[in-house]
């Protein structure tokens, strides 16, 4: 009989301390493989394996592509790569971001649901936004066990709260109680996999993350997931499909970028900010050119032309000032409010 031998853990803001607290209580003879995704910057090395390794009775390391999965080990997603499970091997993929992240919690969880099914235990810890919610739904659909950190304890409760709003989780616990539960559950028999077939959407989305499809097949598969919306992808600017996933509002483009409603909103705000700064740059270049034309017009005694371009400079200055004020938070509809950054994770990278 199969046991619960696949434990997948996702964390974001506040996640370093949460992971340390959880990992230090896992037994040295844990009969399961543990996979961890922590949102970290893409452009810096991660010291998470070393930090966790100092507290863990289990060996901890960044995962290597195509290495065989072994029980009693902790695999950490390296920066800028999705950590995935494929049968009995680890896959590292530099694929499209999900929920603006690479590595993505959803991508790991979905791959575990696809290949490990009821043997999977999913754990969502502290974090901002809602990465992990769709992945936990996939684990639930496949008969796996779902655990979240108690939102009242989590320093950033958005991620565990989001999961609890979407599915009926099996356990909501304090950090001190999660590891003992994992030690126990990993020694219990999992349900029969045949009782929980892989849903078509989980199969398709896991295949997309694992880069198993050619372009034509990818577009056809995206059509199966939902209908084309009137929205565009913040990453590649292609069309977005609205995914049919019960009451969970999600989107995908045909390249493979995936978004929850919350992450799409954040992506749109980032895209808008880039566009507005581009507008400021264009207006300032327009002013520079107009001022050069004014200088030449005055030297040629072309006063009418000079006055016309002076008005253009005034208009461009007014527009540029208004946009700058909006970007810097000095106007209503402030878009310059910073998103919650994983400052703690950045400090260890």
Can you name each region flagged by the protein language model?
Residues 1-295, 311-332, 346-348:
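Conserved acid/base catalytic micro-environments in cytosolic active-site loops
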């Amino acid at each position: 009989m199969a046991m619960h031998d696949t434990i997948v853990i996702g964390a974001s803001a506040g996640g370093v301390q949460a992971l340390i607290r959880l990992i230090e209580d896992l037994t040295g003879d844990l009969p399961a493989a543990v996979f961890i995704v922590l949102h970290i910057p893409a452009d810096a090395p991660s010291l998470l394996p070393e930090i966790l390794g100092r507290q863990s009775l289990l060996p901890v390391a960044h995962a290597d592509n195509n290495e065989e999965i072994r029980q009693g080990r902790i695999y950490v997603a390296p920066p800028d790569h999705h950590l995935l499970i494929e049968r009995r091997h680890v896959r590292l993929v530099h694929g499209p971001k999900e929920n603006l992240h690479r590595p993505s919690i959803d991508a790991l969880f979905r791959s575990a649901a696809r290949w490990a099914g009821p043997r999977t235990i999913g754990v969502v810890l502290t974090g901002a936004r809602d990465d992990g919610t769709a992945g936990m739904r996939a684990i639930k659909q496949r008969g796996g066990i779902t655990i979240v950190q108690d939102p009242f304890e989590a320093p950033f409760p958005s991620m565990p709260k989001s999961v609890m709003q979407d599915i009926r989780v099996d356990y909501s616990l304090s950090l001190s109680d999660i590891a003992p539960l994992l030690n126990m559950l990993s020694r219990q028999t999992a349900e029969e996999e045949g009782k929980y077939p892989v849903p078509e959407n989980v199969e398709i989305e896991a295949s997309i993350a694992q880069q198993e499809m050619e372009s034509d097949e990818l577009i056809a598969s995206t059509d199966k997931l939902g209908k084309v919306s009137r929205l565009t992808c913040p990453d590649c600017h292609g069309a977005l499909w609205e995914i049919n996933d019960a009451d969970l509002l999600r989107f995908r483009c045909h390249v493979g970028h995936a978004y929850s409603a919350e992450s799409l909103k954040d992506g749109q705000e980032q895209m808008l900010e880039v566009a507005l700064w581009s507008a400021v740059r264009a207006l300032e270049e327009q002013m520079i050119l107009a001022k050069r034309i004014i200088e030449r017009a005055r030297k040629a005694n072309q006063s009418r032309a000079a006055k016309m371009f002076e008005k253009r400079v005034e208009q461009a200055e007014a527009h540029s000032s208004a946009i700058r004020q909006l970007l810097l938070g000095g106007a209503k509809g402030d878009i310059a409010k910073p998103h919650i950054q994983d400052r703690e994770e950045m400090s260890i990278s």
